[in-house]
Amino acid sequence: MLTKKSIFLAILFTLSMIMVACSSQEYTTAKLALQQSDWAKASEWLPKAMAVEPNNPEIPIVLGVEIYAKDSQWANMVNMFETAMGINPEKVIEVRGPFISVKDAVSNYTEFYWAQEFNIGVEQFKKIQEGPDNKPDYLETAIFHFINA
């Protein structure tokens, strides 16, 4: 038979584990905003979550991918990736489903967005032959995307 003391200790242990494993209210609010595609609210709460959880490398990755990359703010995205790498590159995090290390997430997203920008630049460059009248505009846009890549 379990004594009251052992039941109390088991409940106390369970509650303490739940509290340690939970994200902050700020990060939970930001994740909920992302699920609802409320980008303005997410961009408001993710920096707050970073302030409350400065040792959580998942938050800067999410901020970089879901807010900065979405808005083509590449310098800010890279800054967030560097922040996450500085916290703990080996920590396993969950971003958009799979659990991977911070260093793998940074590598994957950097490569993905580089390829995306490069391909947009190639498409703009190809348009020069299709519409020579707009050659300067297409060339300028292509150069812009190649620089971003």
Task: Tell me the role of every PLM-derived stretch.
Residues 36, 63, 68-72, 127, ...:
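Structural motif corresponding to the intra-repeat A-B loop/turn of tetratricopeptide repeats
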Residues 67-93, 143:
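TPR/TPR-like (Sel1-like) alpha-helical repeat modules
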